[in-house]
A protein has these predicted regions:
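Short beta-strand/loop motif that positions the catalytic acidic residue
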Residues: 216, 222-224, 228
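Conserved alpha/beta-hydrolase "acid-adjacent" motif
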Residues: 229-235
């Protein structure tokens, strides 16, 4: 599924950890490339949702890559299941290495959406020297679930790790009915429900990040919609407040919902991302 078929990008894959085939899309920079952006989608998403974003950034001189995490999009693996968010981070690592090899010497930025933001943060903690900056969009650090429910899921993940327990509503991702209709018709996310183990591992990754935000030193851009029902803007505020980076920016979008780059008003969000990257490429 690509909301903008004229900007689908070229499809590729590489052998990831455990031999799984990891799919990704790539968009070549228009003219001489100035930098690189690697995109990490979250739940109810995949690389196909970033065609319009990537084509615009490519026109601005960026080589853009978007990964399908294992078990998602067109990548191999049990659907939506993960043993550890470290496995997702290994998928990101594989794509980053490919992007660096194809664009030697260029600054590389990493953008993660929602759960993809958690993955991006986990990856960044171990690879800050390779990155020029981190962009976290609708960061899934705090979610609208009580602590006791999260604790129960962590326990259940040991007993029934493959049980599917969390289904996000597509209508909470965008106020644009065209986007929601496209999501509803997308076979790659049809009936997407997260297994107990996946949800528990995200909670464990968030626990780790809580102790590690002060270790971030690279430039960070944090974006969140005030009406996001899938993740809490307070989580992005917490990241901003505790990040060790001296170059950090928090942008809240009044009235926007979960998928900022596919929501009404997405043009302003992309303009802000583009301006932020441009300012650091000078």
């Amino acid at each position: 599924m690509d909301l903008h078929l004229e900007a689908t990008g070229s499809e590729h894959s590489f052998a990831g950890k455990d031999g799984l085939n990891i799919a990704y899309k790539a968009w070549s920079a228009v003219g001489t490339p100035r930098g690189v952006l690697v995109i990490v989608p979250g739940f109810n998403s995949h690389s196909g949702y970033y065609g319009w974003v990537a084509s615009n950034l490519a026109a601005d001189g960026l080589a853009v890559y978007a990964v399908d995490l294992r078990g998602r999009g067109k990548s191999d693996g049990e659907r939506f299941y993960i043993d550890s968010f470290g496995d997702y981070a290994s998928d990101v690592d594989g794509l980053v290495k490919l992007a660096i090899a194809a664009n030697p010497g260029l600054p590389l930025y990493l953008l993660g959406h929602s759960a993809g933001g958690v993955v991006a943060c986990i990856y960044t903690l171990e690879h800050q020297t390779q990155l020029a900056g981190l962009i976290c969009e609708s960061f899934a650090y705090q979610v609208p679930a009580p602590d006791f429910a999260i604790a129960a899921l962590k326990g259940l993940s040991h007993l029934a790790p493959h049980a599917h327990v969390l289904k996000l509503a597509n209508k909470d991702f965008s106020r644009d009915p065209v986007v929601v209709a496209a999501m509803d018709a997308d076979p790659l996310i049809a009936n997407e429900t997260q297994p107990t183990k996946t949800v528990a591992e995200m909670a464990r990754a968030d626990d780790r990040l809580k102790q590690s935000f002060g270790q971030f030193t690279l430039p960070v851009l944090i974006l969140h919609g005030t009406e996001d029902k899938a993740t809490r803007p307070s989580g992005s505020q917490f990241f901003y407040d505790h990040a060790g980076s001296t170059d950090k920016t928090l942008q809240l979008y009044d009235g926007h919902v979960h998928d900022l780059l596919n929501d009404i008003g997405k043009e302003q969000v992309l303009a802000d991302i583009t301006s932020w990257i441009d300012a650091r490429l000078r």
